[in-house]
A protein has these predicted regions:
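Compact, charge-rich alpha-helical regulatory domains located at protein termini
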Residues: 1-47, 53-59, 63-93
Length: 93
């Protein structure tokens, strides 16, 4: 993926790092009521400016994923991770 690009957390693979730039539930398939997914993601620490790294992908289907968010680890489904918009880091000069 292109560094500096904004993508959904659900598209990242194991070992990739990024920074949260926002949340967007539009088009996300979830069993939760409107607003509930966003509330849960915020409770997990997935807020603007948080730094994260994908630590683990489930087998089969790469679902769920384990993500280090700042100083703690959370697990979530890729479908829900699609609501988290992240920016990939730029290469160090």
């Amino acid at each position: 993926m292109v560094e500096g690009l904004t993508v959904s957390l659900g598209r990242l693979g194991k070992g990739q790092k990024a920074e949260v730039v926002g949340l967007d539930e539009q088009g996300v398939v979830s069993t939760l009521q409107a607003g509930e997914l966003e509330r849960r993601l915020i409770e997990m620490g997935l807020v603007e400016g948080a730094h994260l790294e994908v630590l683990h992908e489930g087998f089969p289907g790469r679902d769920p994923i384990a993500v280090r968010v700042d100083d703690h680890t959370v697990a979530l489904r890729r479908a829900e991770a699609a609501a988290v918009l992240v920016r990939l880091p730029k290469a160090a000069v």
